[in-house]
């Protein structure tokens, strides 16, 4: 069976256009730019994210003071 000439031409054109699109540097550059933007956003947001953590640690320490005071009064000041 003899294949038509236009079929070979169509296969070659589709193959080349697909490989040229796949090998294009533009999608890679966009992916790298997106990754860099995400890394910069994380670097800028990190100090802001630490403030609530320190606030929670401080509050947990302050809320434990009444329990500590009760323990000291019960065991050391008033005796067991």
Swiss-Prot record:
The keyword Signal applies. The modification Asparagine amide is found at residue 78. Coiled coil: none annotated. It is found in: Secreted. Keywords: Amidation, Ion channel impairing toxin, Neurotoxin, Secreted, Signal, Toxin, Voltage-gated sodium channel impairing toxin. Vertebrate selective toxin that causes pain by targeting tetrodotoxin (TTX)-sensitive sodium channels in peripheral sensory neurons. Is able to inactivate rapid activation and inactivation currents of Nav1.7/SCN9A (on mouse channel EC(50)=18 nM, on human channel EC(50)=30 nM). The leak current is via the central pore of the Nav channel. Induces a strong hyperpolarising shift in the voltage-dependence of hNav1.7/SCN9A activation, while voltage-dependence of steady-state fast inactivation is unaffected. One of its GO terms (cellular component) is extracellular region. This is Delta-myrmicitoxin-Ta3a. Residues 1-23 form the signal peptide. Expressed by the venom gland. One of its GO terms (molecular function) is toxin activity. Residues 24-49 form a propeptide. Belongs to the formicidae venom clade 1 family.
């Amino acid at each position: 069976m003899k294949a038509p000439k236009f079929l070979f031409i169509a296969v070659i054109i589709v193959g080349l256009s697909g490989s040229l699109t796949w090998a294009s540097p533009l999608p890679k550059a966009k992916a790298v730019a997106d990754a860099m933007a995400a890394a910069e956003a994380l670097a800028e947001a990190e100090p802001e994210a630490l403030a609530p953590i320190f606030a929670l640690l401080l509050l947990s320490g302050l809320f434990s003071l009444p329990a500590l005071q009760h323990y000291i009064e019960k065991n050391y000041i008033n005796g067991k």
